[in-house]
Amino acid sequence: MSSVPASAYLTLAIILFCIGLFGALTKRNTVIVLVCIELMLNAANLNLVAFSKLGLFPNLTGQIFSLFTMAVAAAEAAVGLAILIALYRNRTTVQVDEMDTLKG
């Protein structure tokens, strides 16, 4: 039975994180920025699971941390979308550049 090396998991996680970081820094649509942040969190989850499974003492700690991170990411997405809906009702736009003032 062949096993996937740890470097493959880490390379995939780095690629996912870089794609998410690039999207979060360059895109102007707030929904896309939230999706890119979720992609970065998933890359971190992949690292947690890979190190847990392929480490010196394999155990379930990485999987448990990954599940906890997914719960936090779901809450973050819900709060982010709620804020986005409130801003859209107030400003009628979801562009990041348009949201530069606090009131008015």
UniProtKB/Swiss-Prot annotation:
It is an enzyme of class 7 (translocase). InterPro entries: NADH_UbQ_OxRdtase_chain4L/K, NUOK/Mnh_C1-like. Keywords: Cell membrane, Membrane, NAD, Quinone, Translocase, Transmembrane, Transmembrane helix, Transport. Coiled coil: none annotated. Its main location: membrane. GO terms for cellular component: NADH dehydrogenase complex; plasma membrane. It is a multi-pass membrane protein. GO terms for molecular function: NADH:ubiquinone reductase (non-electrogenic) activity; quinone binding. GO terms for biological process: ATP synthesis coupled electron transport. It catalyses: a quinone + NADH + 5 H(+)(in) = a quinol + NAD(+) + 4 H(+)(out). Its EC number is 7.1.1.-. It is found in: Cell membrane. The chain crosses the membrane at residues 4-24, 31-51, 67-87. The keyword Zinc does not apply. NDH-1 is composed of 14 different subunits. Subunits NuoA, H, J, K, L, M, N constitute the membrane sector of the complex. NDH-1 shuttles electrons from NADH, via FMN and iron-sulfur (Fe-S) centers, to quinones in the respiratory chain. The immediate electron acceptor for the enzyme in this species is believed to be a menaquinone. Couples the redox reaction to proton translocation (for every two electrons transferred, four hydrogen ions are translocated across the cytoplasmic membrane), and thus conserves the redox energy in a proton gradient. Belongs to the complex I subunit 4L family. NCBIfam families: PRK05715.1-2 (NF004320), PRK05715.1-3 (NF004321), PRK05715.1-4 (NF004322), PRK05715.1-5 (NF004323). HAMAP family: NDH1_NuoK. This is NADH-quinone oxidoreductase subunit K. The lineage of its organism: Bacteria, Bacillati, Bacillota, Bacilli, Bacillales.
